[in-house]
Structures are given as C-alpha cells and as structure tokens.
C-alpha cells in the first residue's frame, strides 16, 4: 500500500510554481539538488524517513495506476532491491515505474560514476548481477511508443493518440 505521495522538486526558482501547486492541493513535496538527482533522492529518503520508494518521473503524467499496483505487489512479495518495467523496456516510454529499496539506494551512492547520479537507476542496471531486480513485462511489446510529455508537440501527439486509440 502506498503510504505517502511526495513530489521531489528542484531548488530552482522556475519550480516555485510546482511548490505553489503542491501547497494549494495539500501534496507533500521535497526540494533538493539541481545538479545531483541521486543526492536529491537520498536527502528526501533520510529527511522523510522513507524505507522504499516508487519513482515516476514528471514527464509521465499518464501513468497507468494498474502498473504501479503490479510493481508494488511484486516488490512486497519477494523483497527485491528493484522492481521495474524498464529492464528491459516493453511498456511505452512515459509508462516507466521503478520501486527501489531505500537502504540499497543509499549504500550504492559511493560507488556511482558521475553519469549515474543523473539517472538514478542506471548504476543498478549497469551492475544488475549485484542486485535482485525484477522486471514487469508487458503482454505486447510497446517499447517503441512514446507517451511521455516534455514539449507542447508531445502534448499534442498524446492528445491525438488518446482521441484515436485505446491505451
């Protein structure tokens, strides 16, 4: 069961609008490092006393809640370090869910290369033999579809898909 939803936000003036949205809608948030995404997560884990966490990125506003449930249920049943649906990817981009053991996440920080601090699960996937990772696989390979939204063009593309296709 998900106990808290927390939005991780950059310590950057451009993200003040997100903070205002969170305050207005009584959503918990945490502000952290702009330059080191991994450290932002560690700071949130420690300050908010988080044991495990589910990562869904901001460019994935159309995430399927059933996928979150599948990841959460698998993680809770077998005590994995990570349960994901991107290793290898079979779901569309923009439908990525990762549940990560907080202790393992913190312990791994000292071993990271610079590029692994930006993409927080890259280290685990690069060293997959050292970790218990389970991948949720889609019944149909949709890895070439992109449902993420990073630009206005993405938004209009997704809008068109939603109007014409069952997802």
Where are the regions a protein language model picked out?
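Hydrophobic C-terminal alpha-helix "anchor/cap" residues
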Residues: 1, 22, 124-125
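Left-handed beta-helix
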Residues: 160-167
């Amino acid at each position: 069961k998900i106990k808290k939803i927390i939005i991780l936000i950059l310590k950057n003036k451009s993200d003040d609008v997100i903070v205002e949205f969170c305050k207005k809608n009584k959503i918990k948030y945490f502000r952290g490092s702009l330059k080191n995404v991994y450290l932002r997560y560690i700071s949130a884990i420690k300050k908010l006393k988080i044991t495990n966490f589910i990562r869904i990125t901001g460019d994935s506003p159309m995430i399927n809640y059933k996928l979150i449930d599948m990841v959460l249920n698998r993680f809770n049943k077998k005590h994995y370090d990570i349960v994901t649906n991107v290793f290898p990817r079979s779901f569309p981009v923009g439908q990525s869910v990762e549940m990560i053991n907080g202790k393992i996440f913190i312990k791994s920080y000292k071993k990271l290369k610079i590029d692994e601090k930006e993409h927080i699960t890259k280290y685990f996937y690069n060293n997959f033999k050292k970790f218990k990772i389970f991948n949720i696989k889609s019944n149909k390979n949709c890895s070439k579809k992109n449902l993420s939204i990073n630009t206005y063009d993405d938004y209009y593309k997704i809008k068109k898909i939603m109007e014409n296709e069952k997802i």
